[in-house]
Amino acid sequence: MDVFNVQELSFSLVRDQPYLSAFLLVMGSIGVGRVIYQTLSVFLQTFILPGTNLRKFGAKKGAWAVVTGATDGIGREFSLQLAKAGFHVFLVARNEALLASTAAEIEQKYGVSTATHSIDFSKADKSAYNSLGSSLGSVDVGVLVNNVGKSHAMPAYFVDTPEEEMSDIVSINVQATLQVTHSVLPGMVQRKRGLILNVGSFAGAVPSPMLATYSGTKAFLTTFSSALGEEVRKDNITVEHLNTYFVVSKLSKIRKASALIPKPDAYVRSVLSKIGLPCGASYSGRPNTSTPFWSHALLDYGLTLIGLQSAFISYTHGLHKDIRRRALRKMERDAKLQ
């Protein structure tokens, strides 16, 4: 059928089926209107609208913020910026010396109280969690930041992933989040006030080949946050899963910032200024998820709008294969120098 015949058939359908034509016009208009509305909503949330004021969760009212993985990268920035906002800060991490120095810096800069607790989440047993729970038991926790996390040493196929590495990733990314949240949640429920931030990853929203265990644990955080958020909504507690692309940190192994890869301070500022707003995660079908940093938000919304997850998975697979090749070559060069 040539182009002329197709056009002639289309015109005849419009002429002979006015109701069908009207229906198609209405449906097309609704579809276009919905995309315009959703896009404007995402832009407003990401660039203009303010999030929930932190005073709702006890800032400058004597409440504490608990931060895991609090001495480096994103966790350190959460500790500093929550202190600046008026929270006392309870820092949880493995290295006692870094805990002490970070706590001293916070007290000197912001004049708030601090407390520290050393725990290795990769090896934590029931006794270790009971000890942490006991330390947190009398604390008026307004904010919990489940930030501690671990990824693979380098991208690798699941069949080649060391068992110890798999176990550590699950212990740190999943078990630590469950246990610490379970320790502070009863107090939040009793006080009818609280904010729980679970630091996630795009690897949980879009499966990441060669980081299968890490990707699976981050997907867990997405579902856990949605379920818990619905449970405690009646108690005036906000649960937010932070969908995060790359940030300059030891975990990401990225040292240079860019428009798509912010430094920790810029990333945390975006999170704390957009509490309660899904931003780029709007219309993603992931309740209680927020993608607040502007470039991450646009990327997340773009994936939702265009629906190219399968292409993104393939791209990520290729990227991780290249990263692994370069990492192995570097290991070979280093071995020759020894």
Swiss-Prot record:
Pathway noted in the entry: Lipid metabolism; fatty acid biosynthesis
Membrane topology note: Single-pass membrane protein
SUPFAM superfamilies: NAD(P)-binding Rossmann-fold domains
Binding site for NADP(+): V66, N95, D120, N147, Y214, K218, V247, S249
CDD domains associated with the record: 17beta-HSD1_like_SDR_c
Top-tier EC class: oxidoreductase
PROSITE patterns linked to this entry: ADH_SHORT
Transmembrane parts of this sequence: 20-40
GO biological process terms held by the UniProt record: fatty acid elongation
Residues annotated as the enzyme's active site: Y214, K218
Keyword Cell inner membrane: no
Keyword Transmembrane: yes
Keywords: Endoplasmic reticulum, Fatty acid biosynthesis, Fatty acid metabolism, Lipid biosynthesis, Lipid metabolism, Membrane, NADP, Oxidoreductase, Transmembrane, Transmembrane helix
GO cellular component terms attached to this protein's record: endoplasmic reticulum membrane
E.C. numbers: 1.1.1.330
One Gene Ontology molecular-function label: ketoreductase activity
Catalysis performed (reactions): a very-long-chain (3R)-3-hydroxyacyl-CoA + NADP(+) = a very-long-chain 3-oxoacyl-CoA + NADPH + H(+)
Places the protein is found: Endoplasmic reticulum membrane
Entry-linked InterPro entries: 3_ketoreductase_fungal (IPR027533), NAD(P)-bd_dom_sf (IPR036291), Sc_DH/Rdtase_CS (IPR020904), SDR_fam (IPR002347)
Job of this protein: Component of the microsomal membrane bound fatty acid elongation system, which produces the 26-carbon very long-chain fatty acids (VLCFA) from palmitate. Catalyzes the reduction of the 3-ketoacyl-CoA intermediate that is formed in each cycle of fatty acid elongation. VLCFAs serve as precursors for ceramide and sphingolipids.
Protein name: Very-long-chain 3-oxoacyl-CoA reductase
